[in-house]
From Swiss-Prot:
Its main location: membrane. The gene is LINC02912. The chain crosses the membrane at residues 32-52, 65-85. GO terms for cellular component: membrane. Residues 109-138 are annotated as: Disordered. This is Putative protein encoded by LINC02912. It is found in: Membrane. Keywords: Membrane, Transmembrane, Transmembrane helix. It comes from the Eukaryota. It is a multi-pass membrane protein.
């Protein structure tokens, strides 16, 4: 499964449902990251966001989401997904947290800018599911 434009074609207004606060928070993080990462990495991140949203809709990712993408220039994202740029391995691991972090550009801060959005607890009847998908390109 390679993240291509065809595989993750957007339908305006339907990708992130308004009734899901977790998906809304995820959309915020994705758009924020896309303002920093462009080109291939930006496309991959957007694809990962769509996968995460689908898992939320299916009830697989239960109460919260985590985004994590490593990049040489930024230590940005973790979306409960880690993308290794050298081996081009896509790992998808459901987590129950939503966390987004970007390094501060202000050296006086001496820390990192961290943003997190809480999600409501979902039904306790949903099974605790954790999936991991590993795909290698080429």
């Amino acid at each position: 499964m390679r993240p291509t434009a065809d595989s993750f074609r957007l339908k305006k207004g339907n990708v992130f449902p308004n009734f899901d606060p977790c998906a809304q928070a995820l959309q915020k993080s994705c758009h924020f990251a896309l303002s920093f990462l462009i080109g291939k990495m930006g496309i991959i991140i957007l694809s990962v966001c769509l996968i995460c949203t689908r898992l939320l809709q299916e009830g697989i990712a239960q109460s919260k989401c985590l985004i994590n993408v490593s990049f040489s220039l930024y230590s940005c994202f973790i979306v409960f997904v880690t993308i290794s740029q050298d081996s081009e391995t896509l790992s998808l691991d459901c987590d129950h947290r939503l966390f987004f972090s970007l390094p501060f550009t202000d050296p006086a801060s001496g820390g990192q800018s961290q943003h997190s959005w809480p999600c409501p607890e979902r039904s306790k009847n949903l099974p605790q599911v954790s999936k991991q998908l590993r795909n290698r390109a080429g």
